[in-house]
Amino acid sequence: MTLALNQLQTLQAHGMHTSAVPLADGDSVVIQQIVRVVPSRRIVCRALWRGQAVFAKIFLGTRANEYAERDKRGVMHLLAAHIPTPTLLLDAELKEVNGRILLLASVDDSDNAESLYQTSDAAKRLQLSLSLVEVLAMHHRAGILQTDLYFKNFLVKDDKVYTIDGDGIRNYAALSDAQMVNNLGVLISKLDVLEEEAWLKTLLEKYRTLNPQVVVDFNQVKALSKNHRTSAASSYADKKVFRICTDIEVQTDAQRFFAFARLFSTLALPQCAADYDALITQSVLLKSGNTCTVAHAQISDTEMVIKRYNVKSLGHFFGRMWRQTRAAASWSNAHRLQQLGISTPKPIALFEQRIFGLRGKAYFLSEYIEAPDVAAYFAHERGSLERAATIKQLVQLFYRLYLLRLSHGDTKASNIKIQQGMPMLIDLDSMKQHNIPFYAAKAHARDLRRFMQNWKDDTSLYNAFVKSFKVVYADHAPLKQADILSD
């Protein structure tokens, strides 16, 4: 396998000039694929060493030894506790650059638990969740706490679960009940919020069976899960995607702020406002107004939607130059929804024109989705089963938003697309994460009322939605608040 050019350039930017990285002892490791980059600190790769497939962790910078030792120590704690984890094969220094490398055995034909969860049916997802709870109970019995608890830090092969990423592993003589229950809450928070609603009792029963001495309260774990889920999504969407990180590259100066997803790093994206304006002019206009301009554009083989938020007047400029732009809100909320498992077009880039650091015009780029909006979808004749399934998916989308205390702000039909029977939210600049239940409920009722207005002239469809809302929502209070149901 030949290393892709952009990945070779990543190695070169960190002082390694070839995919065959030389080690201080004269050996070498051939990098085949870069999996993750923490700039100037860590590169995680698939590699070959002495003809054997391995997982390589390259630690760089002044704290390379500290981070390598912490990761190695975590692996040794797992091995000592007989918790399945890839074997540590080599700990060595790099030759050409100040750094350390850890080589771990590759678990061939394994699946990352996160991708497995996302691609499996409900029955397999439940079984995977039970397996992860079982592994977590095993951790806790051994005095081990995984402080970076994500599904992606587990591998699954033939129903066997491997714990990976020693960096987040901490070992204690004994864990308190509070530590274990909080850690369990973190794991539960990684589930789809609807599946947590359905499975939490079963998952907690599994944990109690394996760790009976721990007092596990249903409501406590549910509250912890909600807090961890909201906190993690907000930390990522409100902070992390506005700085350089594994997923995002950021370039900024007095004239611009430019953030783009590394997933689209090979695209020749415009570098200034004038070039974005020119691209919009050359593209298919979807909307042209005083507030914003929307165009369907294409760069290389990638179709995208560019949304430009205009500065309407000098007074408008002075009123908003200190505040977050609506483009930035769209960028943030697109990543928030991705973190929470709610479908939305992939965010590509955020570009803000700056005038001595003050915000001017702003642009949000997202992937273009060829799919009808919800009104156009139902305007076509649909089979009864397909129609009922799509209605249920839409109602479940709103129930997810309710449980997550998220409001969209404008749930007209054109802001919800239907792709292969599944709803997808667009136009996210008014979306809000609510921390206070009263305001969350009030905003959700507004979203529900606006959504149901789309069907006021179609009694059959309106009534079908009402029927589905009654079944899906365990609590009918929000439906009554939105006047969908009466007291």
Question: Where does each model-flagged region fall?
Answer:
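Juxta-kinase regulatory segment immediately upstream of eukaryotic protein kinase catalytic domains
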Residues: M1-Q32, Q220-Q282
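Conserved ATP-binding subdomain of kinase catalytic cores across diverse folds
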Residues: A20-D111, S131-A142, T266-D373, Y399-L404
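AlphaC helix of the protein kinase catalytic domain
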Residues: N112-D121, V374-G383
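Catalytic-loop of the protein kinase fold
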Residues: I144-F151, L406-A413
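Short, glycine/acidic-enriched loop or turn micro-motifs at the edges of active sites
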Residues: F151, G168, E370, A413, ...
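Conserved protein kinase catalytic/activation segment
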Residues: N153-I164, N415-I426
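C-lobe/activation-segment region of protein kinase-like
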Residues: Y162-T230, P423-D487
